[in-house]
Amino acid sequence: MQQSHQAGYANAADRESGIPAAVLDGIKAVAKEKNATLMFRLVNPHSTSLIAEGVATKGLGVHAKSSDWGLQAGYIPVNPNLSKLFGRAPEVIARADNDVNSSLAHGHTAVDLTLSKERLDYLRQAGLVTGMADGVVASNHAGYEQFEFRVKETSDGRYAVQYRRKGGDDFEAVKVIGNAAGIPLTADIDMFAIMPHLSNFRDSARSSVTSGDSVTDYLARTRRAASEATGGLDRERIDLLWKIARAGARSAVGTEARRQFRYDGDMNIGVITDFELEVRNALNRRAHAVGAQDVVQHGTEQNNPFPEADEKIFVVSATGESQMLTRGQLKEYIGQQRGEGYVFYENRAYGVAGKSLFDDGLGAAPGVPGGRSKSSPDVLETVPASPGLRRPSLGAVERQDSGYDSLDGVGSRSFSLGEVSDMAAVEAAELEMTRQVLHAGARQDDAEPGVSGASAHWGQRALQGAQAVAAAQRLVHAIALMTQFGRAGSTNTPQEAASLSAAVFGLGEASSAVAETVSGFFRGSSRWAGGFGVAGGAMALGGGIAAAVGAGMSLTDDAPAGQKAAAGAEIALQLTGGTVELASSIALALAAARGVTSGLQVAGASAGAAAGALAAALSPMEIYGLVQQSHYADQLDKLAQESSAYGYEGDALLAQLYRDKTAAEGAVAGVSAVLSTVGAAVSIAAAASVVGAPVAVVTSLLTGALNGILRGVQQPIIEKLANDYARKIDELGGPQAYFEKNLQARHEQLANSDGLRKMLADLQAGWNASSVIGVQTTEISKSALELAAITGNADNLKSADVFVDRFIQGERVAGQPVVLDVAAGGIDIASRKGERPALTFITPLAAPGEEQRRRTKTGKSEFTTFVEIVGKQDRWRIRDGAADTTIDLAKVVSQLVDANGVLKHSIKLEVIGGDGDDVVLANASRIHYDGGAGTNTVSYAALGRQDSITVSADGERFNVRKQLNNANVYREGVATQKTAYGKRTENVQYRHVELARVGQLVEVDTLEHVQHIIGGAGNDSITGNAHDNFLAGGAGDDRLDGGAGNDTLVGGEGHNTVVGGAGDDVFLQDLGVWSNQLDGGAGVDTVKYNVHQPSEERLERMGDTGIHADLQKGTVEKWPALNLFSVDHVKNIENLHGSSLNDSIAGDDRDNELWGDDGNDTIHGRGGDDILRGGLGLDTLYGEDGNDIFLQDDETVSDDIDGGAGLDTVDYSAMIHAGKIVAPHEYGFGIEADLSEGWVRKAARRGMDYYDSVRSVENVIGTSMKDVLIGDAQANTLMGQGGDDTVRGGDGDDLLFGGDGNDMLYGDAGNDTLYGGLGDDTLEGGAGNDWFGQTPAREHDVLRGGAGVDTVDYSQAGAHAGVATGRIGLGILADLGAGRVDKLGEAGSSAYDTVSGIENVVGTELADRITGDAQANVLRGAGGADVLAGGEGDDVLLGGDGDDQLSGDAGRDRLYGEAGDDWFFQDAANAGNLLDGGDGNDTVDFSGPGRGLDAGAKGVFLSLGKGFASLMDEPETSNVLRHIENAVGSVRDDVLIGDAGANVLNGLAGNDVLSGGAGDDVLLGDEGSDLLSGDAGNDDLFGGQGDDTYLFGAGYGHDTIYESGGGHDTIRINAGADQLWFARQGNDLEIRILGTDDALTVHDWYRDADHRVEAIHAANQAIDPAGIEKLVEAMAQYPDPGAAAAAPPAARVPDTLMQSLAVNWR
């Protein structure tokens, strides 16, 4: 959003203003709406994007400075060194620090700064950061010390900002000033001025002027004079009217005019008029609509006592046009606007020296364009004032006296309401105006002709007296008012009290006027009694009227009839008593004027007083109140019947208290009425007798005193009652426990209600849950609060609590379903794997935290109990177990507000999932959900059509931005219940949850490990991640993007844009009237229109034509017959499923899957290898190009199928299954298909004639029943599936499958492949080289090869072979000569195949034994350790994997060992064979009996190096050897020669010659006198039995002889005796040839004699073991000469060694 505010500017002035474009559009709209020109100061450019992003703005209460550098640019740092003041003097920083502390002490907060990714990008582009490496950002503040900043990503996708001075050690968080809700602040948009049009106030001001007033006369005269002088609405008249409107004292200008120009004072909004407040609020509402917070916080510079000046001002006219004006241009512009009827009033501070920016009030001053300075234009407008009026202080601003000097002769000085900064000063000004008018009237009276100076003086005294009387009357009326509101049973509200106060005040004014008139009438008389008597009568009438008004306020439309009657009687009685008293007073006054005696005066006064006393004593409203109080007690008794059943007795206790209270108050009222009545009667009687007037006075005083005493003790009496009942509560366990029973009872009452049980049972069924966990927040009852208030216990209770129950089918069951921690905000669901619980909130879940209460005296007889929630209030954490849980968050409190309804903070929900597949039903609250393991779903379906969500994927996390418009959210606040107990009032606060409409609300959810997201009814945007997501838009115009993964996307109702992204995606579309954009993206994607069945009503209205889809054109027309122009545009879609109606579907040149579903559909595959499925109905299917598959599943209709080009298949496998055909096994017949005739009969032999017409179709797949499938001359694939099928291939190379059942397969002509499948099958290959695919199951199959070379293949056996017998690892036993194949690994089993005419066999992956016959066989072992025997004939044997044994037997055979260590058994006399070992360590073996080596036969001559083997001296018997490593000879005299590899040569019996050749060989002579030569390499030589000879010489390497005794063995070394060095190495004898690296070791020579040879020959000399031992001893005396030493010259050999050599070598 950082860049979005730059888009949409209409001109350069708009962009220069720094106001975000979207906000500016709202400003222009408000200017038009209010018909006013709006002027603004330029906005800090670094705050522009923050305002657009939704950051809150500061009011006047924040004096700290913002920052213009670094990552904190645009914000207000708590550390002044990070602000724009960085580098300033220490005292400047200290003052700034004080400003920060002051802001934090007055409702603001210190917030850790976090930035969005877009904000970081903006800061880089703006050059405020110089780079980033490893999360550290360098930021230079020019000319000062460098700071380093670090950003760290937080869990909600933002970046926390930390800082340190360069080179410092630890980073710390950058803190900025935020509002009370914790939202960081940036600069607001300052209004410079507002110029409303005169029409905004002219008419209202004119209509509200009061007639008869000297000020009004002045207004009228000046208006007429201005009109006559100008003849129109020129500037002078506008200025004049504006001055009058600004003067606007309440005595002269009406309410509507004051609405435009009244002032208020507030530390955050400053001095602001109501009109300015309306404009400000309208601007902020517009800002909210585009996602911003309040953007304008306070009034204009016109009201600022310390205004600032700007080089430029941004102006928006009332027509919405905008421009940027310099100070010089502003003067001309304001003049033009004034001429058009727009009003501009100027700030007095502008006229102070050093602050003037204008010549003659509006002039030009130099400055830097666009800069903001410390003063701005100002000219003070004034109105007349009286001398000595105290003006509110303007600080250093000097006072100016200017303006008009007179107002009808009133005053000679001017004062300015523009200087007034609070309401108290306004009231003072109005009183001063009133006083001036009165004095003006007095002076005018003094000047009247015919009135003497003494009379004028008396009149002045009378006026003063009248004013004194009026003041006294106000006091009396106030007493009457308190009396009225103090009566028992009074139910007046504070609003009613305010209205009554106004009425009494007006009555006092009227009484004052009467008193003044009477006094004036008797002007010149010295008698005061008449005037004051009338005044007393007027006071009595005022009291009566006050009481009558109090009663009249209860006459509402919904008041009970009894209350209306009592009020009517009260009004009549009070007005009658007051009128009588006033009449007697007037009569008294007239009598006094005529000189009546003072006794008559007293009598009159007594009679009037008696009438008033009687009226006061008989109060119908008081009687009605006592009766109603008694009825209320009866109602409480009814409540108590139910609450007592659940353990709460408080309602019964409160009922009894009210009965006791009624009795006490009734007694007091009765005695009072008797006293008043007796006193009134005595007074009237005494007054009638005249002479008894003194008695009447005394009686009235006495009864009045007694009544006063009686009424005075009434309140203590009922307070004692309250204390008695408080003690009862203490005795019953104390107030805390007592009132908790009320919460428990209310919980039990709801939990056991039939309505709740039914609702929860329905929820359980709808959610497919095993149980429902109900969480209930219960508020205390109003009656319980009332009882607590009366007994003084309102601070000793909880007003709300949370309860949890588990329900199954609506019935409450035992067990603790969750662990609940209200104080910490924790809900842990105790669930196990396999369960499906559901969590729902029966009543809205209140905020977490604990309740603290305190009772405080807030008035004379008023107490208020305050409640505060403390502890963790901003989050509920819900933990799920291992079950598949549904969590319904629809009724959760989203916001916490204070007692004034001001938002404190939002409440976040944190949901931690477990191992199951969970579903979370979200609401307006901000949630963080971690789904954990399983497939998890979050649904926003509860959101309304006006709301929307935007879901973005961030790796494994989703961020969900919820835009809620006109949102209803549950919010918890503090409500107050007022209880009047006599004259005591108790205001009790309690926790209260309500569903509130909050207008616009934006919340961001974070979701992790969530796969499925469901949108709401609004216009949503949902983007998936790399997993396989299920995304549903719901109603509204949605945008879905699956991203990577195989996603399922549901657009729902509305005009949707759906993008699949990477992966194989599925689009589920409704057959609605909306047009959608569908883009499959990469992968193989499918769109389905068969999700919802249209209703009968829709079908009746819209017909049965479904869609016209063409993937090549990229369009899907819905309801085309109605021309609704409802078209989905599709691209990158490979597969399409139609609707349940009659569809027309065409694919494209890709491989499509096209389904018609129900209805009579027409489908064209076009190019590609397509899958076409008509579904139910009469369908026409065209495969066209490509190898197509037709899926048939409706046996009750006849379809038309044309395969077109390619190899096409019609598949009936899905047609017959449970539910498709009534009693499907009744006959057991499936289909009958004959491709040569072009038809397929469905439900064959059942008397039904449903045929599919098939053309250009090569392949058929049958049903699970008994099918007959016949091919044609083409190469067909025919698959029988289940049932006893008959399958005939016909001509061509066919592929036939029998499937399950006892099938008959006939290959007929051609090279066919036949698979019988399970069941006892008969397979006949017919002509051609056929292939029989078999499995070693328990069935008995018959295989007849027929003509040609045929093969039976058991390679698909897998691990099934041999399982039944327990001989795991054994495969088949096949003997083609015997015509039998045992399939369970042993001969004679019941599971065998009968084979005939079969030449070749392929074994299993296990250990098979396969024997050929006299024919030329191909036997393949496949996997396992197989034994293959070719028998007669020229055979081919292939061992395959495993260590196989191969024997070609007779014939010229080819044997291939392939992988594994294979063993070839070969007859040396059988020539012409090829033995190829393949991979592994392979051996050819001539040792076996019957190998052609009889008594007269010769041995084997074999050379692995040359690759042949034959009989000795008979090369014509040669066989070819390849890849053979080892050889085993015969029992004759053999010659075995190795190759360059590591060979094992075993001579067996006979006198053999073994030559290893190169490589590390192993030679085994075995029996006989053998000759062993290891040759090159390190060889091991085993002579075995017999007289063996070992050859060794130079170049032979390191050979080892292993002797085991027996025979006379000899070592022959090709070297001279003097070239040999003998040494003992452990038990071994080592013989080395000097000058070489060759050595011969005789293993275990020193162990015993059996391991020694009898002689060693070197050249012509020999040595025996004894001589060898002597040489070893002799040579041990000399250093080992090493490999490079040559034979020592005789001259150098010591004599002793020479003697030893000569003696031992002979």
Swiss-Prot record:
Pfam families: Anthrax_toxA, HCBP_related, HemolysinCabind, RTX
InterPro entries per the UniProt record, alphabetical: Anthrax_toxin_C-terminal, Anthrax_toxin_edema_cen, Anthrax_toxin_edema_cen_sf, Haemolys_ca-bd, Hemolysin-typ_Ca-bd_CS, Hemolysn_Ca-bd, RTX_pore_form, RTX_toxin/Mannuronan_C5-epim
PROSITE patterns membership: HEMOLYSIN_CALCIUM
Segments annotated as Hemolysin-type calcium-binding repeats: 1014-1031, 1032-1049, 1050-1067, 1155-1172, 1173-1190, 1279-1296, 1297-1314, 1315-1332, 1335-1352, 1411-1428, 1429-1446, 1447-1464, 1468-1484, 1537-1554, 1555-1572, 1573-1590, 1603-1620
Subcellular location: Secreted
GO cellular component, one term: host cell plasma membrane
Keywords: ATP-binding, Calcium, Calmodulin-binding, cAMP biosynthesis, Cytolysis, Hemolysis, Host cell membrane, Host membrane, Lipoprotein, Lyase, Membrane, Myristate, Nucleotide-binding, Palmitate, Repeat, Secreted, Toxin, Transmembrane, Virulence, Whooping cough
Record region (C): 913-1656
TM ranges: none
Keyword Cytoplasm attributed: no
Region feature (A, catalytic): 1-399
Lipid sites, type N6-palmitoyl lysine: 860, 983
Entry keyword Calcium: yes
EC numbers, comma separated: 4.6.1.1
Location of the region described as Disordered in the Swiss-Prot/TrEMBL record: 367-405
GO biological process, one term: killing of cells of another organism
Similarity comment text for this entry: In the N-terminal section; belongs to the adenylyl cyclase class-2 family.
Domain notes: The Gly-rich region is probably involved in binding calcium, which is required for target cell-binding or cytolytic activity.
Protein known as: Bifunctional hemolysin/adenylate cyclase
The organism of origin for this protein: Bordetella bronchiseptica (strain ATCC BAA-588 / NCTC 13252 / RB50)
